[in-house]
């Protein structure tokens, strides 16, 4: 049986870890490399770096942060933000990233996903989907550019399409729940997870440890991502994993 993964997410803006509510109102949470080293020591299964300004403000990729993290950490690292070309992916992988997350560029040009998967293998290509519920309907729309730009694209159909093109994993964030601490958008998570044959990482809204369990058990995700509950010391990675084990979920526990 697969082991459920617990993945801290480090949103990085101007070289600092930040955490906000609904993609805005950002507050500082520390140095990204120091945070990565701490999470590695704490037993995180993976780490996700997202440069949340890279696409919006056309910034380059934070290669120095990636390089220093890869040198210091054993856990797999996924990096996203400002990834627009095959060369961007190559540079990140050479800098030490294990997987690369594509967001706005995949929406703008679906074939980019296919090109990336064919060149580097689907195991290292993650498509990040930021979705918001369409009012009054069981439908979710994709937003890009750090959640600033609506697309009119249906999230479920898009997920199925990018998986058919070679995406090896979906990183799914509910913009309605992001930073609210009210739990994952379970209907959205389940709808995406049940519609594709690749791992789905649930993201957006974790406020307590039960929410992590719900993402797997009710949302059918294969991994859960959280930020603020870990960044500000409310819970440790070990506490999260122990709680999930008590709930009957298969976890990797370090000695």
Swiss-Prot record:
GO MF annotation, one: lyase activity
Active site feature: 11, 130
CC per GO annotation: cytoplasm
EC number: 4.3.2.10
Compartment(s) of residence: Cytoplasm
GO biological process, alphabetically ordered: L-histidine biosynthetic process
Broadest EC class assigned to this enzyme: lyase
Disulfide bonds: none
Pathway per the UniProt entry: Amino-acid biosynthesis; L-histidine biosynthesis; L-histidine from 5-phospho-alpha-D-ribose 1-diphosphate: step 5/9
Pfam families assigned to the protein according to its UniProt record, in alphabetical order: His_biosynth
Main location: cytoplasm
Sequence intervals crossing the membrane: none
Domain of life (superkingdom): Bacteria
Keyword terms, alphabetized: Amino-acid biosynthesis, Cytoplasm, Histidine biosynthesis, Lyase
Catalytic function, reaction form: 5-[(5-phospho-1-deoxy-D-ribulos-1-ylimino)methylamino]-1-(5-phospho-beta-D-ribosyl)imidazole-4-carboxamide + L-glutamine = D-erythro-1-(imidazol-4-yl)glycerol 3-phosphate + 5-amino-1-(5-phospho-beta-D-ribosyl)imidazole-4-carboxamide + L-glutamate + H(+)
Chain's role: IGPS catalyzes the conversion of PRFAR and glutamine to IGP, AICAR and glutamate. The HisF subunit catalyzes the cyclization activity that produces IGP and AICAR from PRFAR using the ammonia provided by the HisH subunit.
Sequence similarity: Belongs to the HisA/HisF family.
Protein name as catalogued: Imidazole glycerol phosphate synthase subunit HisF
Organism from which the protein derives: Rhodopseudomonas palustris (strain BisB5)
Designated gene of the protein: hisF
């Amino acid at each position: 049986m697969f082991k459920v993964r617990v993945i801290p997410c480090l949103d990085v803006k101007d070289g600092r870890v930040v955490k906000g509510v609904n993609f805005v109102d950002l507050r500082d949470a520390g140095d990204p490399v120091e945070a990565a080293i701490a999470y590695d020591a704490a037993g995180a299964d993976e780490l996700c770096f997202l440069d949340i300004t890279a696409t919006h403000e056309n910034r380059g990729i934070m290669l120095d942060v990636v390089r220093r993290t890869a040198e210091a950490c054993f856990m797999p690292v996924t990096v996203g933000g400002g990834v627009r070309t095959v060369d961007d992916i190559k540079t990140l992988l050479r800098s030490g990233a294990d997987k690369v997350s594509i967001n706005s560029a995949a929406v703008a040009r679906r074939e980019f996903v296919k090109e990336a998967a064919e060149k580097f293998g689907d195991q290292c290509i993650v498509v990040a989907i930021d979705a918001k519920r369409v009012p009054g309907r069981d439908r979710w729309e994709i937003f890009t550019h750090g959640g600033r730009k609506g697309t009119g694209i249906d999230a479920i159909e898009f997920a199925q399409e990018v998986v058919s093109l070679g995406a090896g994993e979906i990183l799914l964030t509910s913009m309605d729940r992001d930073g609210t601490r009210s739990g994952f958008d379970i209907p959205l998570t389940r709808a995406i997870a049940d519609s594709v044959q690749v791992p789905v990482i649930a993201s957006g809204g974790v406020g307590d440890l039960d929410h992590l369990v719900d993402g797997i058990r009710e949302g059918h995700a294969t991994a859960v991502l959280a930020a603020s509950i870990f960044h500000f010391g409310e819970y440790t990675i070990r506490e999260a994993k122990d709680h999930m084990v008590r709930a009957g979920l298969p976890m990797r526990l370090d000695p």
